[in-house]
Amino acid sequence: YKLLRAALGADVPIIINPGSNTRLEMMSACDIAVTYESDATKYLSRTRQEIHPDQYQGLPSWRFWHIVHGITKENVDKVCEKADDIDVGHLYLTDQTFAVGTGSEDTPQEDPYDDPPSPWVVPKIRSWIKGVLPLEQRLSAVEAKVAAKEN
C-alpha cells in the first residue's frame, strides 16, 4: 500500500476487490474494499453479520463497496435499504446477471459486466447516492394513490 500510495499520490484511491468479507488487516492495504460481490437474492437473504461483519465497525462507510447484480424492479429498493442499514458507502447495482452455464467462472455464459445496467437502474442508484431514495419512494406511493382515485 505504501509503495502504491507513493507512486500514485494521494489523489488516486487504492481499491481492492476480494468480493467478499476480508480480514480486517486487509483494510490497511487499501482505501476502499469491495466486500460484497454477488446477486441480489443472496444480498437480501443474508444477515448483516454475513455481509458486513462487526469487525468493520468503527471504519467509515466510504471504505466499503458492494456490487450487487441481478437486481429487479421488485427488489431494487430493498437492496438499497439494506445497503443503507449496513452503512455501505459505495454501491454498484446492475440488473445484468451471472451464470456459468456452458462457460466457466472466468468466462461465464452470462456476465453482469458485459453490458451496462438497464436505463431504469440509473435513476435508482443516483437517488441512493444523493440520499433521496426514501423520499422518492414515498412520493411515488402518493402519486400511485392519486392516480388510482382519479380512475
Where are these regions (language model features)?
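Amphipathic alpha-helical oligomerization/assembly segments
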Residues: 134-149
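Glycan-processing catalytic domains of CAZymes
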Residues: 1-137
